[in-house]
């Protein structure tokens, strides 16, 4: 069966793995998922990630991060979805928890955080919120 929203599936796998204290989580890989994992690593929400498997069926393995026995990611939720795309201009990109969290935005210059998008003066599709 085909997956209608692979990004929501990625976020759900991360959320579920952290609820049962898993150290790693595996999922099918794509360029967009790798870009999101890169942003999560740069922002300190995950320890690392690695693309494994064959060229025909690559798999993304994410190593989750915990602090004092609790997951670093407290909240991770999908914003724009296939049935309702959410686009924001450069001046309307939302802040998550007054800047304590990040919104991951897909722009014409690549996938980046809300702060970086505002600094570069670009808007785009708001993929998810992470706090």
From Swiss-Prot:
PROSITE patterns: RIBOSOMAL_S8 (PS00053). Keywords: Ribonucleoprotein, Ribosomal protein, RNA-binding, rRNA-binding. GO terms for cellular component: ribonucleoprotein complex; ribosome. One of its GO terms (molecular function) is structural constituent of ribosome. It comes from the Bacteria. One of its GO terms (biological process) is translation. Part of the 30S ribosomal subunit. Contacts proteins S5 and S12. One of the primary rRNA binding proteins, it binds directly to 16S rRNA central domain where it helps coordinate assembly of the platform of the 30S subunit. Belongs to the universal ribosomal protein uS8 family. This is Small ribosomal subunit protein uS8. The gene is rpsH.
